Each structure stands twice: as structure tokens, then as C-alpha cells.
Amino acid sequence: MKFEEFQLERNQSLFENEVDYNLSESGVHPLKISEILSSDEQNQILDKELYYGYTNGTPELRQRVLDIYDQNLSLDNVLITSGSAEANYLSIMTQLDAGDEIIYMVPNYLQIFHLARSLGIIVKTLPLKHELGWQW
């Protein structure tokens, strides 16, 4: 299987470290540990053993998410990912098969668009119009 090149991400990767002001970046500048944790909290981390963590998120974090959204579900219904790209990938890989159809709003971040097409999923676009206030 050959995946389509994700041109936006490719261009950002090529040039993101070559500019003084990166206007294409959608994330935030990384913080330092000292900006997040107190000295005591930093020392606590230094005393922790390193081990292979929970791939689906710690039970405590999953419970906190569950507490926010719905009390009628169990921890098995909550999955923590390392970011939206992983969540998008898991959604496509577990919910769709070749020949299935999805409707995808554009303009948008095109990760799902290219991944789905590479897997034989039919992608129909729903263009949002500037002149209609980004509605369809």
C-alpha cells in the first residue's frame, strides 16, 4: 500500500526550522518543565521509576475524562491518544473499510482525507464557502 503524500505536513516539515516567524504552525511553543512544575514537583519526577506506561492512558486520567463527559460509561469506553493525529488514524482504521464512504468538510486539515483515500475509502468533500461565512 502506498500512502498519498500529505503535502501540507511535508512543506511544514521542510521549512519549519528555517524561518524566524512560523505562521503555519498550529501548535504552541513548548514550555519548559520549570514553567509547569514547582521545584518540589520536579524533584518528585526525578525520583520516579521509568517503566512502560499505559498505552490507552492511565486509569486516573481516563476516569477524569469520564467524569467530565458521562457517568454511564466505563473506563473501557475512554481511550487517551498522544494527539489528534493518532485519534484520527485510529478512527479511520477501526471504523471504515475499503469501499466505505465518508463526507469530509474542506478546507480542513487533510490528514484524514489522504489516509482514507489511501485505504480505498471513498472521500466526498463538503466545501465550506467563504462567501457564506464558511457554511455550505
Predicted feature locations:
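Short, flexible loop segments at the rims of nucleotide/cofactor-binding pockets, characterized by
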Residues: M1-K2, L79-I80, L128-W134
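N-terminal small-domain helix-loop-helix segment of the aminotransferase-like
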Residues: K2-G83, L90
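Short amphipathic alpha-helical segments
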Residues: E35-I36, I92-M93, L115-R117
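Conserved glycine-rich SAM-binding loop
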Residues: G83-S84, N108
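PLP-dependent aminotransferase-like
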Residues: L96-W136
